[in-house]
């Protein structure tokens, strides 16, 4: 964007700013309307390479940590590269232009078309990875995307945009395919975007998600996390502890899929805690647990402190006044759950390297406690099970109302898809109607396609009444 354009937009009303950006996005879409599948896939590759290149990924991550104060550079760099690589693997070669499916016997042909200008509200926890991920999926459908960063994520998003534009120019595509709401960041402009785009995707605060759902714009907004892991009596405890440590500590638990609670069958509780300690955890006593709770939720009403979220463990220990030297050297903290619900905020999402543990008498109790935690916070999002009992793996799938359930995997790594499971790679995960979402799966490129279904006349071959009603009438009569 030219300095003149930036200056003009700074003096415009929010509705004028968003209207201009949408018009530019629509013109960019017109310019690629005739792109074939190969050209579209090249757009996706361009957006991916913009932040996958290692030096860029590290630079963007450093900006994100400096400006948001959340997470750490090494993990953010790894996340950008892993998620971008995985998403690109999912997208390349998949049909998204013109005829994408034809069923000759049924006379059905499906033709893919763009959804329009996509609005994406970007969270401060992933200010570099999320906009690129959304842009790749939107471009796969020949859409334009308009990004709305958080105040802390503005500089990161600007750098991401700079690199995406450079790559789009290399392939001769209009840079207005990917734009950003210009600074200063404001709710007025973000809300205007929510109201005016053709399709909306909000990943972030509960307030933004709720406002996006109330906009009336078709949306794929996603619910809050509060991932729970069950450790049953058959689990390999050392392997389980390593998985939970990975999930709990990665990027200082800024992910919505980071484990927040571990529900442990009583017969292995002490051994599981010991394994977690061996993996780097510090087990807090009652006094230390109270100190941590007061530090994480200083208002006493369950509101999470922004000063503590996404911080290194040593800083949390210092802020909470944990004087034990082992606490200052820990990778994460264990606190015993005393209850579930608003009066027990440690049972909710903490966005910090603090894991709440619950002892339960048996697997039935584990299922009951897990659902109770999710009913309080994180409905529909995710949970995990560490087990060697295949029967337990199937039972939990029927019993717990979540959209993704990982067996013997670190949730932070696996919920958003990986090469170790069959889930689509994404940074936006729907929680279904349980979480108040329209989306009940991992966001992918198919959500950014409109489809025209052409139905040709075929030779009729209807069933008989006997085919449809025979079994019912045999059982119940006429």
Give short role names for the model-derived ranges.
Residues 97-239:
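Rossmann-like NAD(P) dinucleotide-binding subdomain of oxidoreductase/dehydrogenase enzymes
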Residues 1-109, 137, 278:
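N-terminal Rossmann-like NAD(P)+-binding subdomain of aldehyde/semialdehyde dehydrogenases
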Residues 6, 29, 33, 323, ...:
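Conserved C-terminal structural/oligomerization subdomain of aldehyde/semialdehyde dehydrogenase
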Residues 34-39, 58-61, 174-177, 252-255, ...:
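Flexible, glycine/charged-enriched surface loops at secondary-structure junctions
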Residues 5, 12-14, 132, 140, ...:
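ALDH superfamily catalytic-core signature
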Residues 22-29, 33-36, 44-55, 64, ...:
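Structural signal for hydrophobic packing residues in well-ordered secondary-structure cores
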Residues 21-23, 221-223, 252-256, 344-351, ...:
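Short, flexible turn/loop "capping" segments at secondary-structure junctions
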């Amino acid at each position: 964007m030219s300095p003149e354009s930036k200056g003009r937009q700074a003096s415009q009303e929010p509705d004028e700013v968003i209207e201009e950006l949408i018009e530019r996005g629509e013109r960019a879409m017109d310019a690629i309307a005739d792109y074939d599948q190969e050209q579209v896939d090249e757009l996706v590759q361009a957006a991916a390479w913009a932040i996958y290149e290692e030096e860029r990924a590290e630079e963007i991550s450093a900006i994100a940590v400096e400006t948001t104060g959340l997470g750490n550079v090494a993990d953010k760099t790894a996340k950008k590269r892993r998620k971008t690589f995985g998403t690109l693997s999912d997208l390349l070669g998949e049909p998204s232009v013109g005829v994408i499916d034809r069923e000759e016997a049924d006379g059905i042909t499906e033709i893919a078309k763009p959804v329009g200008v996509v609005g994406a509200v970007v969270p401060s926890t992933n200010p570099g990875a999320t906009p690129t991920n959304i842009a790749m999926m939107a471009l796969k459908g020949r859409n334009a995307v308009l990004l709305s960063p958080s105040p802390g994520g503005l500089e990161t998003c600007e750098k991401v945009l700079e690199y995406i534009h450079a790559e789009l120019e290399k392939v001769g595509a209009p840079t207005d395919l990917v734009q950003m709401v210009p600074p200063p960041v404001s709710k007025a402009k973000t809300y205007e975007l929510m109201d005016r785009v053709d399709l909306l995707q909000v990943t972030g605060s509960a307030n933004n998600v709720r406002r996006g759902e109330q906009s009336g714009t078709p949306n794929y907004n996603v619910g809050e996390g509060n991932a729970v892991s069950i450790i049953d009596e058959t689990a390999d405890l050392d392997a389980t502890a390593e998985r939970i440590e990975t999930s709990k500590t990665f990027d200082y638990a800024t992910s919505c899929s980071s484990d927040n609670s571990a529900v442990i069958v009583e017969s292995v509780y002490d051994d599981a805690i010991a394994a977690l300690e061996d993996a780097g955890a510090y087990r807090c006593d009652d006094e230390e647990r109270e100190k941590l709770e007061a530090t994480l939720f200083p208002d006493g009403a369950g509101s999470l402190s922004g000063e503590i979220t996404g911080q290194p463990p040593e800083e949390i220990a210092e802020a909470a006044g944990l004087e034990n030297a082992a606490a200052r050297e820990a990778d994460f903290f264990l606190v015993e759950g005393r209850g579930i619900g608003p009066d027990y905020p440690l049972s909710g999402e903490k966005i910090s390297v603090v894991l709440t543990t619950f002892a339960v008498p048996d697997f039935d109790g584990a299922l009951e406690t897990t659902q109770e935690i999710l009913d309080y916070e994180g409905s529909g999002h995710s949970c995990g099970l560490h087990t060697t009992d295949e029967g337990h793996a199937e039972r939990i799938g029927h019993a717990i109302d979540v959209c993704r359930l990982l067996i013997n995997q670190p949730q932070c790594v696996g919920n958003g898809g990986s090469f170790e499971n069959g889930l689509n790679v994404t940074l936006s995960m729907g929680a279904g109607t349980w979480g108040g979402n329209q989306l009940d799966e991992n966001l992918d490129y198919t959500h950014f396609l409109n489809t025209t279904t052409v139905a040709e006349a075929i030779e009729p071959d209807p069933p008989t009444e006997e085919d449809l009603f025979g079994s019912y009438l045999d059982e119940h009569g006429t």
